[in-house]
Swiss-Prot record:
Name the record gives this protein: Hemoglobin subunit alpha
Organism in which the protein naturally occurs: Marmota marmota marmota (Alpine marmot)
Gene: HBA
GO MF term set: haptoglobin binding; heme binding; iron ion binding; organic acid binding; oxygen binding; oxygen carrier activity; peroxidase activity
Lineage: Eukaryota, Metazoa, Chordata, Craniata, Vertebrata
Cited SUPFAM superfamilies: Globin-like
Residues the entry annotates as binding O2: 58
Amino acid sequence: VLSPADKTNVKAAWEKIGGHGAAYGAEALERMFLSFPTTKTYFPHFDLSHGSAQIQGHGKKVADALANAAAHVDDLPSALSALSDLHAHKLRVDPVNFKLLSHCLLVTLAAHHPAEFTPAVHASLDKFLASVSTVLTSKYR
């Protein structure tokens, strides 16, 4: 459960990310594909080379979804309902992949904002991403 301090940290972090969200999303995807090659199986139609338009486009989708979640942190199930349906019923993404992408996103944010990535902010973002992952996998049952 996200505390009021966590929610404040998440919203502040997302404001700091600002216009870099798409680039950070793409970078996190690239990190995931390099670090966890089995995740590539969900993207057989993508050009997975560094900086490809498809990775950039999907990175923007990831960033936009997370920005929406941060803006609606008090009602994640409603904010992410359509994405949960998509990933559970159409794409059938293994739920472990959300954790892998979350880890890669945390690494990306820490690399770009080391001064702001305090232990408290790290913990808040980790809890937020875990909450997002939980909602995205809620319709798998």
